[in-house]
Amino acid sequence: MAKGGNKLMKLKSVLKKLNSFNTKPNQPPAQTNHSRSSAVSAFPSEDLQTVYVGRTRRTYHVSSDVVSHPLFQQLAAVDGGCGSEDGSISVSCEVVLFEHLLWMLENADADESRPESVYELVEFYAC
């Protein structure tokens, strides 16, 4: 049980860090385009790629900007999920965490990126 509690404490710590630099004063919340079976990024590119997430292989259609993001690349590399024959990507990550990742990428400000937390996030997101 101590191992699970330790992971939970680390996850809370990482989420606090993310929330501290993702909150921007005097800005309305960003609108996202999430649906139950797919999540389309708010990035400008219209080139969508299929991503299968988790044990249930839930289908998401995300922009190439999301797929090319370093955090997404790290997560896919850890899971060995990049590049199948049909161009789809498999990520063995919990669906809720993947949706949080999409939210973070859609709401992140490029000037506020924190590379030191990328590795912590990948460690928690990978199953």
Swiss-Prot record:
The keyword Methyltransferase does not apply. Expressed in cotyledons, hypocotyls and roots of young seedlings. Expressed in emerging lateral root, leaves, flowers, stamens and filaments. GO terms for cellular component: cytoplasm; nucleus; plasma membrane. May be involved in the regulation of ethylene receptor signaling. Promotes cell expansion and plant growth. Involved in the regulation of cell elongation. Induction: Induced by ethylene in roots. Induced by auxin in roots. Down-regulated by abscisic acid (ABA) and paclobutrazol. Residues 20-40 are annotated as: Disordered. Keywords: Cell membrane, Cytoplasm, Developmental protein, Ethylene signaling pathway, Growth regulation, Membrane, Nucleus. This is Auxin-responsive protein SAUR76. The lineage of its organism: Eukaryota, Viridiplantae, Streptophyta, Embryophyta, Tracheophyta. One of its GO terms (biological process) is ethylene-activated signaling pathway. It is found in: Nucleus; Cytoplasm; Cell membrane. Pfam families: Auxin_inducible (PF02519). Belongs to the ARG7 family. It is a peripheral membrane protein. It comes from the Eukaryota. It comes from Arabidopsis thaliana (Mouse-ear cress).
